[in-house]
Regions:
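Periplasmic N-terminal accessory/gating domains of Gram-negative outer-membrane beta-barrel systems
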Residues: 2-107, 117-125, 140
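Alpha-helix N-cap/helix-start motif
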Residues: 80-81, 110-111, 154
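Outer-membrane beta-barrel domain signature, especially the mid-to-C-terminal portions
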Residues: 30-31, 179-182
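Predominantly transmembrane beta-strands of Gram-negative outer membrane beta-barrel pores used
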Residues: 70, 98-107, 115-123, 130-180
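Short, surface-exposed acidic
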Residues: 52-56, 158, 182
């Protein structure tokens, strides 16, 4: 009389990120916008994400403060992700490929954060021809130009330059409003 015992090894899921959301450029640009599309404004419409006012793009995620979030651009920390006094994010939506947002339960490699993790991933430049675009809105102007790099040893590459300029300082100067002056 022989007893045969068989078992299977239980699989361990290394990635169990329940609150991860991936946004692409189409989703960011189709969201309702305050003057122009903004990734932080898009994220503020998600469950668990709040803001203090219509004039703040700061992300309050699940009761945490904005300084408890980790904001990254292509995996590198961005320490001041706000533009125009916090009304907009510094990220130009014309160059965003996608954004990965973790509203909790994120991996330990992002340790020391209690709020959220946002990794904005830039898109590649145009590798076939030189193109550009410009946009003028009520409070800012932005431009983008991109094109291919010369082929070198069979490799293709591209370049991209993007910039945004607000009119805040010119409006303040025109209205003669003293800011920080005695």
């Amino acid at each position: 009389s022989e007893v045969l015992v068989t078992a299977e090894r239980q699989k361990f899921e290394r990635s169990m990120e329940s609150s991860q959301i991936a946004l692409d450029l189409r989703e960011i640009n189709s969201a309702p916008a305050f003057v122009e599309p903004d990734i932080f404004r898009t994220l503020q419409m998600l469950p668990g994400v709040q803001t203090t006012s219509d004039f703040s793009s700061a992300l309050y995620v699940r009761g945490s403060t904005p300084d408890q979030n980790l904001i990254m651009l292509d995996g590198i920390a961005v320490y001041n992700p706000y533009h125009l006094g916090g009304i907009f994010s510094t990220f130009n939506t014309d160059v965003i490929k996608e954004a990965d947002f973790h509203a909790g339960g994120f991996p330990a490699r992002y340790g020391g954060r209690m709020g959220a993790i946002l990794n904005v991933i830039n898109r590649e430049g145009n590798t076939t021809k030189t193109t550009g675009m410009a946009n003028i809105s009520l409070i800012s102007s932005k431009a983008l130009i991109e094109g291919p790099l010369p082929k070198w040893r069979g490799m293709k590459g591209s370049w991209m330059i993007s910039g945004r300029r607000t009119y805040f300082d010119t409006v303040i100067d025109a209205l003669k409003i003293p800011l920080g002056q005695n």
